[in-house]
């Protein structure tokens, strides 16, 4: 049986935590930032966790993580 390929885009976006979850970066922080408040941008800088409903999809993209 052949090896399963890792989705490289997903490997760059998600990191597995010690408890088995996945951490991710928040979106909306690349461009069009002048209309967003400093508080909003500051909160978007922090990492977030992948939701349980989406975790199955992330695991399918990262078979060896």
UniProtKB/Swiss-Prot annotation:
One of its GO terms (biological process) is translation. Keywords: Ribonucleoprotein, Ribosomal protein. Residues 10-26 have a biased composition (Basic residues). Residues 1-26 are annotated as: Disordered. GO terms for molecular function: structural constituent of ribosome. GO terms for cellular component: cytosolic large ribosomal subunit. Disulfide bonds: none annotated. Gene3D superfamilies: 4.10.410.60. PANTHER family: 54S RIBOSOMAL PROTEIN BL35M, LARGE RIBOSOMAL SUBUNIT PROTEIN BL35M. Belongs to the bacterial ribosomal protein bL35 family. HAMAP family: Ribosomal_bL35. This is Large ribosomal subunit protein bL35. It comes from Mannheimia succiniciproducens (strain KCTC 0769BP / MBEL55E). The lineage of its organism: Bacteria, Pseudomonadati, Pseudomonadota, Gammaproteobacteria, Pasteurellales.
């Amino acid at each position: 049986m052949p090896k399963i390929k890792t989705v490289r885009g997903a490997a760059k976006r998600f990191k597995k935590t010690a408890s088995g979850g996945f951490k991710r970066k928040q979106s909306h922080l690349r461009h069009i930032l002048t209309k967003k408040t400093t508080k909003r941008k500051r909160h978007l800088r922090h990492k977030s966790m992948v939701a349980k409903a989406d975790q199955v999809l992330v695991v399918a993209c990262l078979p060896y993580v």
